[in-house]
């Protein structure tokens, strides 16, 4: 049996859009719009434009049926390298924690 040592993972930081009440400020924004804005803010903060990351993990509390492959579409909407793989997770109230556990 072949032993693979644990992979080193770095969670470099995070960004989010500001909180607001439901059905107010973000009513006309899509999940993709909001997630892409948060991801691009992270890319800008850490000067990652053009870089291919090992994985991008994004979370949404609720997704619409049109949000298929949401994280991948968001990566393509940023200045990250298009080859960067991505996945998203939906978990009400625990999305960020669950995503960090999966990545780490």
Please describe what each predicted stretch is.
Residues 83-93:
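Short pre-catalytic strand/loop immediately N-terminal to key active-site residues, enriched for Gly-Thr
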Residues 1-84:
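Conserved "HGTGT" condensation-loop signature of ketosynthase/thiolase-family condensing enzymes
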